[in-house]
UniProtKB/Swiss-Prot annotation:
Organism: Burkholderia cenocepacia (strain HI2424)
Binding site for substrate: N264, G321, I322, M323
NCBIfam families: PRK00696.1 (NF001913), sucCoAbeta (TIGR01016)
Catalytic reactions of this protein: succinate + ATP + CoA = succinyl-CoA + ADP + phosphate; GTP + succinate + CoA = succinyl-CoA + GDP + phosphate
EC number of the protein: 6.2.1.5
Cofactor names: Mg(2+)
Name listed for the protein in its UniProt record: Succinate--CoA ligase [ADP-forming] subunit beta
Any Gene Ontology CC annotation: cytosol
Pathway: Carbohydrate metabolism; tricarboxylic acid cycle; succinate from succinyl-CoA (ligase route): step 1/1
Binding residues for ATP: K46, G53, R54, G55, E99, A102, E107
Classification via SUPFAM superfamilies: Glutathione synthetase ATP-binding domain-like, Succinyl-CoA synthetase domains
Length: 388
């Protein structure tokens, strides 16, 4: 789960991290009111969307008068903000953050992530703040410094000081940087975050260290114990299809292709999408019905996929272990009839009650294309999507 910058800064404040004064605004008049409350002479008007690259896309403006705050708020609020992370369709801006201006001398980068290779929490830092860290990692990997943090000890003073020095924090400001890094770690750890990022971490002309931006991602599996984080959820920033899928316990992610995929198990789902691409097709979605699929869940899965106007064909790929093939067959038949399926449907089933499931499909009278292997299924669905 993602949250907005202003929400991330609320979390940072709770853990003692220095951030500029600022508040969210949901209208132009509210933006002006917040600016007046903060006082001048400089304010930053920031679009709040769940994507990076807002500045380059025109979603961050520096205002030097209340009139400019109104002008920029009017420009940004309601705009379709396009960044390298939103795709060409962009994301509508429904809220702003109005913040006091900052004296920027150095822009640094710090973040905490879970490194899946070492299976450790890693603190990363770079002197190249204010930029895409992916770009820095690609062009100048030597400028990224890493520290492994052991949960049993937390981020030690020496570790924080060493990283701060390596990324260019002046010696006199290192105690401030240490407090910010340790606060960031505590926020990451105690909220079950999967990412906690400050970009940029600013060092001002007088040596003051502050977090000018805040980005958090949270482990959705841990949200049950963090109602205060769930309260930050903004459904306007999420894919409506993914929200609908979550109501039925379906793991669904929209993609850009035209071949719908209905699979049980995340690993098999990814392998299915890879095989479709291998034979020249493009998946329209990731959809894992899980091990406890019911007729209702399969029907809802069909409904979700058919809401995609680009959909040309559907591949159902099931391995019947916990999930019985006859139950899936029942769901496929009911789902196809319920939605008046009008695109080619390829079904491949293996495992528990496989023969029964195949017989049910064959006797259904529906124009289902059968396949025995994943490769055969992928080839058939790619051909069907192409109208062959």
């Amino acid at each position: 789960m993602k949250i907005h910058e202003y929400q991330g800064k609320e979390i940072l404040r709770k853990f003692g991290v220095a951030v500029p004064r600022g508040k969210p605004a949901f209208s132009v008049d509210e933006a002006v009111k917040v600016a007046e409350e903060l006082g001048g002479p400089v304010w930053v008007v920031k679009a709040q969307i769940h994507a990076g690259g807002r500045g380059k896309g025109g979603g961050v403006k520096v205002a030097k008068s209340i009139e400019q705050v109104r002008e920029y708020a009017n420009q940004i609020l309601g705009m379709q903000l396009v960044t390298h992370q939103t795709g060409p369709e962009g994301q509508k801006v429904n809220r702003l953050m109005i913040e006091e201006g900052a004296d920027i001398k150095q822009e640094l980068y710090v973040s905490l992530v879970v490194d899946r290779i070492s299976q450790k929490i890693v603190l990363m830092g770079s002197s190249e703040g204010g930029m895409d860290i992916e770009e820095v990692a690609e062009k100048h990997p030597e400028l990224i410094h890493k520290v492994i943090v052991e949960p049993s000890t937390g981020l030690l003073d020496a570790q924080a000081d060493d990283l701060a020095a390596k990324i260019g924090v002046p010696a006199a400001s290192i105690p401030q940087a240490r407090a910010i890094l340790q606060g960031l770690y505590k926020a990451f750890w105690e909220t079950d975050a999967s990412l906690a990022e400050i970009n940029p971490l600013n060092v001002s002309g007088d040596g003051k260290v502050t977090a000018l931006d805040a980005k958090f991602n949270f482990d959705s599996n841990a949200l049950f114990r963090h109602p205060e984080i769930v309260a930050y959820r903004d459904l306007d920033e999420e894919d409506p299809a993914e929200i609908e899928a979550s109501k039925f316990d379906l793991a669904y992610i929209s993609l850009d292709g035209n071949i719908g995929c209905l699979v049980n198990g995340a690993g098999l789902a990814m392998a299915t999408m890879d095989t479709i691409k291998l034979f020249g097709g493009e998946p329209a979605n990731f959809l894992d019905v899980g091990g406890g699929a019911t007729t209702e869940k399969v029907t809802e899965a069909f409904k979700l996929m058919l809401k995609n106007p680009d959909l040309k064909a559907i591949l159902v790929n099931i391995f019947g272990g916990i999930m019985r093939c006859d139950v899936i067959a029942e769901g496929v038949i009911a789902g196809s009839k319920a939605v008046n399926l009008n695109v080619p449907l390829v079904v491949r089933m293996k495992g528990t009650n496989e023969d029964l499931g195949k017989k049910m499909l064959a006797d259904s009278g529906l124009p289902i294309i059968s396949a025995d292997s994943m490769e055969e299924a992928a080839q058939k669905v790619v051909a069907a999507a192409a109208g062959k």
